[in-house]
């Protein structure tokens, strides 16, 4: 039995609030249950040095947590003068995941930065950031299209979404909250496209190694869950 009472294949309630910020070209407040992340997409008319004069653009990401996003206040990383390893790992994952569905040549020599700021954390912040980040990216590209800068359907090749799965109390479960994640026997994150392509899989056994059969169960849960998330993304951008 899961602490939340959810079924093994039941995700938390997911919602997207588009255009949350009046300043950013694209923005979305994404909620996976009690995990809330503000994703903003900012356009800059420049590219990283290694892409200059190539005709290609770039999509990158930064990730952070508000000091009281968790049960106890955390010190701001800016106050410490450097980012932690976890932060760097997560923001690179977000950037890779979004670039997987972007035609950088069609974007042109421009950079879009996704800022994913966790307002409240209850497990799955990286997967929420990727899933909500896609919405913010889409709205940024629509903003560009309205100004005759690009065509969205040429730049954005597919949807991308992410979900966590794990083995909790000897059962394969989807979308772990913090209570489950902190005591899971196996923890994995899956990033996939709308067409079912695998972008990235991160899986770790916290104690006893997991079996191929358990991994197959997690993969099945993830495929179904990401299918649901992509359907919710489509519903959000149609509204």
UniProtKB/Swiss-Prot annotation:
Top EC group: transferase
Q: Please indicate if the UniProt record lists tRNA-binding as a keyword.
A: yes
Which sites bind phosphate? 86, 124-126
Q: Which SUPFAM superfamilies match?
A: Ribonuclease PH domain 2-like, Ribosomal protein S5 domain 2-like
> Which CDD domains does this UniProt record tie to the protein?
RNase_PH_bact (cd11362)
What does the subunit section of this Swiss-Prot or TrEMBL entry state?
A: Homohexameric ring arranged as a trimer of dimers.
This chain's protein is named Ribonuclease PH
- Where is the organism placed in the taxonomic lineage, from the top? Bacteria, Pseudomonadati, Pseudomonadota, Alphaproteobacteria, Hyphomicrobiales
């Amino acid at each position: 039995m899961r602490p939340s009472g959810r079924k093994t294949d039941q995700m938390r309630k997911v919602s997207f609030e588009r255009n949350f910020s009046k300043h950013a070209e694209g923005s979305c407040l994404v909620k996976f249950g009690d995990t809330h992340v503000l994703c903003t997409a900012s356009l800059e008319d420049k590219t990283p040095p290694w892409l200059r004069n190539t005709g290609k653009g770039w999509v990158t990401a930064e990730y952070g947590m508000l000091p009281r996003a968790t049960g106890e206040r955390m010190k701001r990383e800016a106050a410490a003068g450097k980012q932690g390893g976890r932060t760097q790992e997560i923001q690179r994952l977000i950037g890779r995941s979004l670039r997987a569905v972007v035609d950088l040549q069609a974007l042109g020599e421009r950079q879009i930065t996704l800022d994913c700021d966790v307002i409240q954390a209850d497990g799955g912040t990286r997967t929420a950031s990727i899933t909500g980040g896609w919405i913010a990216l889409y709205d940024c590209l629509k903003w560009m299209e309205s100004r005759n800068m690009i065509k969205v359907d040429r730049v954005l090749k597919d949807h991308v979404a992410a979900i966590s799965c794990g083995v909790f109390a000897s059962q394969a479960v989807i979308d772990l909250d913090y209570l489950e994640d902190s005591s899971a026997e196996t923890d994995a994150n899956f990033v996939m496209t709308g067409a079912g392509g695998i972008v990235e899989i991160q899986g770790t056994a916290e104690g006893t190694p997991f079996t191929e059969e358990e991994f197959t169960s997690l993969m099945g849960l993830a495929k179904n869950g990401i299918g649901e998330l992509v359907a919710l993304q489509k519903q959000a951008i149609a509204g």
